[in-house]
Amino acid sequence: MVTKSSRWQMGMVFAGLLCAVEGSFVIRTVTAAGGAPPVKMTKEEDRKKMMDALGIESLRPGKAGRDKTDPNFANYDESKANPYPKLPDPLTLKNGKKVTKASEWWNKRRPEIVEDFDREVYGRVPKNMPKVKWEVVNTTNGKNGDVDVVTKQLLGVVDNSSYPDIEVKIQLSVTTPANAKGPVPVIMQFGGGFGAPGGAAAAPNAGPPYGPNAFSPARGGGFGAPGAAAGAGRGAAGGPGAPRAGAAGAPAGGAGRGPAAGAAFGAGGGRGPQGPTWQQQVLAKGWGYASLNPGSIQADNGDNLTLGIIGLMNKGQPRKPDDWGSLRAWAWGASRAIDYFETDKAVDAKHIAIEGHSRYGKAAVVAMAYEPRMWTVYVSSSGEGGAKLHRRNWGEIIENVAATSEYHWMAGNFLKYAGPKTWDDLPVDSHELIAMCAPRPVYLSAGKGGYDDEPNGDSWVDAKGTFLAGVGAGPVYRLLGAKDMGVTEFPARETEVGTNADLAFRQHASGHTDGPNWPFFLEFSAKHLK
């Protein structure tokens, strides 16, 4: 039994292990007696080690995302966007047989697709994952707008008895209406921290210290340059917001820059200059919201792959080629959050949605695909490695994600498709990731995009490639008795398709932000509340 006194002592030790420095955290690692400490490698060293294991001598460079005069500038010409127009058929087994029954999808084809994503794209979650013990460390009564709310701050302590050198403490907050008459649906967002008391959005880069091996989260999860400091991508308001530049330059060995200039930043999301925050929009429906800190699960960089949950499971050693990357680790953390929600009487655990923007949009669709308890998902500007088709030559491409700034998101095997192999050699594509979510509702989103929309647009994430992935998942939705978007032609900007279906898409008229489409996602979700 944990007493108030012991909780206080735990909190003081927890806070004392870290020192906040300009939005990041200095971590003091204490090596267990008799245990080998985690291997220390830079991301360049780690990626080179993986390339050597795969027999890869060099990788193709990623595209530049900002400078239109760069000879390696990203392609935004639709006539050059589809070098590999034939996608893998989600309803054809590897033996060539067509899938015509739902049972064949569940028992045969879906497992084939999962295996390909596990081995080649996102990596495998280790067997015998440790237990996570959730503890409410703070409860606050307050207001968000004009709604009385209760906010719980939690730590999910991962059992590290197999390797005490590494501690993982998952940071989660959940806010519910104080006057709710029963359990409420919860929209969980990747990318926050504990949040501010009373449920208000925390300021960018603010928050309490993280666990002893946890790291400063990429709060907005935005682009910035590959290798940019965590926090590039969303504004405190989250609507169009004030433009703000990302970190300058890619590190040596990295890809070209991703577009950050003009993108909105921060943790809040969901409003323009004066409108309600996304959290207030959720509360207006009588629902709750949650914030899951990915940095408390696994660092968003390749320098720390021997730490975090990945390092814990590998006992501080480097990854194997099919080991999981950060996206799959963050998705695992979302599943553990659902474990907690199933014990919280204020939460309707059958209606947990997940939302993520940019890199966290990638994590959100991965979480939805792998976690059957997830109700619905809002995938915002996820780009390459998320809902965008891998085979599309538009904006961010496989080579960008294989750079030292981003490779840690994926399995090591993913590097092959930026080196000796081509995009077309991938056994799967992102329409099949969306199909893994079927028949549950999926909302796909991106901002304006095209050569003339830069540098203040969302071209990098390929709105059309995301839409086409949704189209490609449609046959699986129909097979399972669900409704696809009902269209195959890319819709006009600000035209929602799939409004009354199980798959929906909308391209808004702003830049790299999730703000404008929050109201549409919430209306979409409400139609699927059963």
Residues covered by each model-derived region:
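C-terminal catalytic histidine-bearing segment of alpha/beta-hydrolase fold enzymes
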Residues: W409, G457, K464, L468-K530
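Conserved strand-to-loop "acid loop" that flanks and positions the catalytic carboxylate
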Residues: A438-V461, H508-S510
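Alpha/beta-hydrolase fold nucleophile elbow
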Residues: A346-S358
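Mobile cap/lid helix-loop segments that gate and shape the active-site cleft of serine hydrolases
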Residues: I309-M313, K320, R336, T376-L433, ...
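Glycine-rich nucleophile elbow surrounding the catalytic serine of serine-hydrolase chemistry
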Residues: G356-M368
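Cap/lid segment of the alpha/beta-hydrolase catalytic domain
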Residues: V186-A346, G383-N393
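N-terminal pre-domain segments of enzymes
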Residues: V30-R124, R219, F223-R271, L522-F524
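N-terminal cap/lid segment of alpha/beta-hydrolase-fold proteins
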Residues: A102-S103, N107-P111, Y122-V184, G191
